[in-house]
């Protein structure tokens, strides 16, 4: 009987020790994770250049990061009140280009100054501007790929801005940025993303895998 009690006690001590170690490990793991207050740190964020015309046909561009795919043929962008929203009120068509390492400085510039009080804003970018073939909006030729879009919906519209849902009418891509399969080659474009944590731009790197394919090895 004493031997049985001793065995039970040994098992309990062993289990307690294991549980204590497990709790210690969990505590240690938690200590390695620092908490931050809620903020706009969705990573990575795109660097979208929105092109519009005002009522007199003068081109404007702005830099936007809060945007993404809304549906197969639609995008959504969060817009504050800008010259861009003024333009879209009279001409609901736009282009959306993707900023690159080469266009970074001017792309940042159009996000810093407003077309409302900077008459020569576009001249300072040095960009080559043409009218888009399918919508009434400007195309900036220095960008490798541009979406031609039409406004479809404005969500939660107020004096401070709204969420813009736009239909993709057509996609333009410079031929020198096409891959062997004839489709846009993202690596060639040297696109940049916005780091909202440190307020920097980061160039996209190399391909590391095949989507909807590489994960099958874990099935």
How would you name each of these model-derived features?
Residues 6-17:
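Bacterial N-terminal signal peptides
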């Amino acid at each position: 009987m004493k031997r049985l009690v001793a065995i039970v006690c040994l098992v309990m001590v062993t289990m307690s020790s294991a549980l204590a170690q497990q709790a210690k490990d969990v505590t240690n793991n938690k200590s390695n994770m620092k908490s931050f207050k809620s903020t706009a740190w969705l990573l990575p964020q795109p660097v979208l250049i929105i092109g519009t015309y005002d009522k007199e046909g003068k081109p404007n561009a702005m830099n936007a990061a809060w945007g993404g795919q809304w549906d197969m043929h639609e995008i959504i962008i969060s817009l504050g009140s800008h010259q861009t929203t003024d333009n879209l009120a009279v001409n609901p068509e736009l282009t959306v280009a993707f900023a690159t390492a080469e266009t970074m400085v001017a792309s940042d510039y159009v996000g810093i100054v407003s077309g409302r009080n900077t008459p020569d804003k576009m001249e300072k970018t040095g960009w080559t501007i043409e009218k888009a073939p399918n919508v009434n909006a400007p195309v900036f030729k220095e960008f490798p790929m541009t979406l031609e879009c039409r406004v479809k919906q404005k969500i939660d519209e107020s004096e401070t801005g709204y969420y813009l849902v736009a239909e993709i009418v057509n996609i333009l891509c410079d031929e020198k940025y096409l891959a062997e399969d004839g489709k846009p080659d993202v690596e060639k474009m040297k696109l940049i993303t916005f780091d909202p944590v440190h307020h920097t731009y980061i160039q996209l790197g190399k391909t590391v895998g095949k989507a909807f394919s590489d994960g099958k090895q874990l099935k």
